[in-house]
Each structure stands twice: as C-alpha cells, then as structure tokens.
C-alpha cells in the first residue's frame, strides 16, 4: 500500500514537471519572437540597440583614448630637510637594500634616488579638441605648479593652465602634441532624462586609469552645497561608480557625448556608495568657452554683504519664512549703495527670479550680463520696495554663514560701574580706548564690544563689535538691556545683533526666551 502511494506521488510530480517544461518552452518562444523589443507598463514597445543591450564595448572603445590621467611631480628632497628619513619611510624596501648593500660594502646613493621624480595622482580629465585642450575640475589642479598628463597609451606631457574658475570648479588645460589628439565633444545635458544610461571613465584612486563604469541618471538639478564658493546648483546625480580620482573625468551618454563633468561623491566613508554628481555639460560648456577666450570668468556684483535668513532672524524682523537674503553691509559707492540698498534690507526678488538664499542669488547674478540693469525687490520695515540696480564687474558678494541658532539661558549680571553686562554667557562692554586698542577697532567705529564668552562653542567671537540691535544703532550697553527686556515683554524669541568683525558684517540672533 505504501509503495502504491509513493508510485502515485512520483507520477503526479512527473506530470507537473511536464506541464512546467511546456510553459517554459512557450515562454522561451515568446522571448525569441520579441527579439530586441520589450514592453513597459502602459507603453508601446521600445527598441534597444544591440550594442547597448549586450555590451557598452563599441561605445566605450573610441572614447577611452580621449580620457587622461592628471598628476603632479614631486621630489623627495623637496619635501623637507629630513629627505633621507622620508625616503626610507616611504620606500621601506630601501631600508632592507641598504642593510644588504652595506654588508657587501656597496654604497646606496640615497641622494640620487631622491632626485627621481615621484608622480602624485590628482584626478582625471578629457580632451575636447585635437590641439590638446583638456577639461578637468578646478580642485584637481588647484595650487599645483607642475601638471602632468598621461594618455591612455601612456604617453606623457606637461600641461599648461589656460584658465580656471573656482566658482564652477572647472579648469582648462593644454598639452602640445605633434600629432592631432583623439577628442570628445559636449552633448546637450538638457536632453538627458532620469533613468538614462550614462558611462563614466576616469582614473579612480590614482592608479586605475581608463576605468569604465556605468549606471543611470538618478536625478537632475541637485544642489549639493559642495562648498560655499561653488555656484553650481543643478548637478546630475548618478549611481555609476565614481571614486576619488574620477574628479574631472567625463560622463557620457550612449551617443558618446559628454553630458557631465564628474565632480563629487556623497559618501560617509569617502568611497563610492552609488551617489555621484557631475556638472551638467550645458553649465560647463559656456564656462570652458570663456576660459578658452579670456583665461578667466568675470561675473557681476551688487556690492553688498549678504547672509541667509533663519527662523530666529525672520522672527525679529517680522518676516514670514526664510526665503530671501539679508543685507548686513553695503559697500560705499558700490552698485547696491547707489541703488539705495541699506543694512537690514531683505532681498526677495532679482528681476523676475525669486531669491531663495545666498547661493541662489549668487547663481542669478552669475547669469546676469555685466552692466545690465535689473529691478531688485526688497523688504524694508515690512514694506516692499523696488530698486533699479546695475550689475557691475568685480568680486562676488561676500557671504556670511555665522547665523547658527543660539538658545542659551539668559543671565543678567550688571556690574556696578555699568561698563559691562552678561547675557547668554556672553559679556558685553562699552567701547573704551583700552578695548579699542586691544581689539584693533578703528576710531570711526562705535558700538559695544564682546569681552568674554563663557561657553566652549559660540557663534560670537571676542572683539566682536555690535553696532546695531534690531533696527537701532547702539553705543551703550544700557540700550542693550532696554531692548532685551522690551523683547521679553513682547514675548519675542530673539533680538538681532549686527556684528562687525574685521572687514565684514553679520546679523546674529541673541535669544531672550
């Protein structure tokens, strides 16, 4: 009986396998019939090129020769007075050789070895013209005296710097070759879409030149705040592997066009985790053209010092939200001064473009032709004003970022002589000749000064000169206390101090709650 049950189970399993095999066979036939087509949900069949479906080899092969490794040359004996020690430390095998050769009475000439140039990898780049013009990142070649270029065939050249632009992190180099060089062309990054395939070629970790990786465009228009100096706010994000050393290398689309300059990665560990960023070609190309023509990029300015709004600052000024930028200083006889901009004004619109923060304003100004007149919309004492202003060529606006929140308990400790007062662990004093000399405060400056900070971390600094509180000028600490107590009675959270620190000014909120 048991044997009969086992027999029946085997028969059922065999029958099921036959059915499954038949279904799989039918499925394979469907795939064969579809050939190079697939159907997306709710879409028509899409064609996929044979080359891209099975391999990127045909796409990549002609591109690799146009991608270069960038390095600099360093000599050990240029590094320090302890050249011999440094040399043995960096090349531990020399220590072993020295011992062996010493036993054989053969001298090891470390001085000659130290004269041997050592290549220090910097990053990647790509050739954009047969005459040897090369695009890379500014941060790759910044502060480097000798720039060495190695081609895919290991041919090496010394490059000269044609021009650079730290604001967009781009640089243009040139090498001189007797033969025309392979090159690549920029494509239109505006045509690229999220989900498109992209290919990155570069020199990761400085010794893996010609490395090819692929991925898709994960997002566009990313503002990643690479640093406060950078004005690019529309990075392309990709999951193609980008590592240290890939900086300055090209990002290609499947049409073999450069649609981005690989620039940065997001990684807590400093290695690729699938989040890389590239400067779009439509941002890079006009900058490169200006570097080719002039060797630099000139931009306009307003002649004001600006800072981002915070909730604390907005609350004091009676402004809703944090969109806009706060003017903390106006350069005398500058464009802003001539237009009538004042300290404490909030810039909310530049022409027909809304101003979200300091970086956005800098980007807008960078896009504005020099000497063009625009309408600037500002808020002053809760009223909107429109001021015409002409953008002139010079350095960019000074940005202040010392607007961190300060929420310390308030301690009032007025001294008997009424020369100083302590609030939030910060001691303020009337400005005396002794303090003016100690903190190098010019004679034409008035205000109260910070003489002590009783906390480890503070946005304030010793010697900070407070010239205004809210909209009022101040030159006596008694006024600080009056304004402070009035703010508490009105149930305000902060008062706003205008600090002069060296050549710049910044608004910093002081908590009263």
Swiss-Prot record:
<dbReference type="InterPro" id="IPR001940">
    <property type="entry name" value="Peptidase_S1C"/>
</dbReference>
<comment type="similarity">
    <text>Belongs to the peptidase S1C family.</text>
</comment>
<feature type="binding site">
    <location>
        <begin position="302"/>
        <end position="306"/>
    </location>
    <ligand>
        <name>substrate</name>
    </ligand>
</feature>
<dbReference type="InterPro" id="IPR009003">
    <property type="entry name" value="Peptidase_S1_PA"/>
</dbReference>
<keyword id="KW-0645">Protease</keyword>
<dbReference type="GO" id="GO:0030288">
    <property type="term" value="C:outer membrane-bounded periplasmic space"/>
</dbReference>
<keyword id="KW-0677">Repeat</keyword>
<feature type="signal peptide">
    <location>
        <begin position="1"/>
        <end position="23"/>
    </location>
</feature>
<dbReference type="Pfam" id="PF13180">
    <property type="entry name" value="PDZ_2"/>
</dbReference>
<keyword id="KW-0378">Hydrolase</keyword>
<feature type="domain" description="PDZ 2">
    <location>
        <begin position="418"/>
        <end position="502"/>
    </location>
</feature>
<dbReference type="InterPro" id="IPR036034">
    <property type="entry name" value="PDZ_sf"/>
</dbReference>
<feature type="region of interest" description="Serine protease">
    <location>
        <begin position="124"/>
        <end position="289"/>
    </location>
</feature>
<keyword id="KW-0574">Periplasm</keyword>
<feature type="domain" description="PDZ 1">
    <location>
        <begin position="290"/>
        <end position="381"/>
    </location>
</feature>
<dbReference type="InterPro" id="IPR001478">
    <property type="entry name" value="PDZ"/>
</dbReference>
<dbReference type="GO" id="GO:0006508">
    <property type="term" value="P:proteolysis"/>
</dbReference>
<keyword id="KW-0720">Serine protease</keyword>
<feature type="binding site">
    <location>
        <begin position="245"/>
        <end position="247"/>
    </location>
    <ligand>
        <name>substrate</name>
    </ligand>
</feature>
<dbReference type="Pfam" id="PF13365">
    <property type="entry name" value="Trypsin_2"/>
</dbReference>
<comment type="function">
    <text>Might be efficient in the degradation of transiently denatured and unfolded proteins which accumulate in the periplasm following stress conditions.</text>
</comment>
<dbReference type="GO" id="GO:0004252">
    <property type="term" value="F:serine-type endopeptidase activity"/>
</dbReference>
<keyword id="KW-0732">Signal</keyword>
<feature type="active site" description="Charge relay system">
    <location>
        <position position="139"/>
    </location>
</feature>
<dbReference type="InterPro" id="IPR011782">
    <property type="entry name" value="Pept_S1C_Do"/>
</dbReference>
<protein>
    <recommendedName>
        <fullName>Probable periplasmic serine endoprotease DegP-like</fullName>
        <ecNumber>3.4.21.107</ecNumber>
    </recommendedName>
</protein>
<feature type="active site" description="Charge relay system">
    <location>
        <position position="169"/>
    </location>
</feature>
<keyword id="KW-0346">Stress response</keyword>
<feature type="active site" description="Charge relay system">
    <location>
        <position position="247"/>
    </location>
</feature>
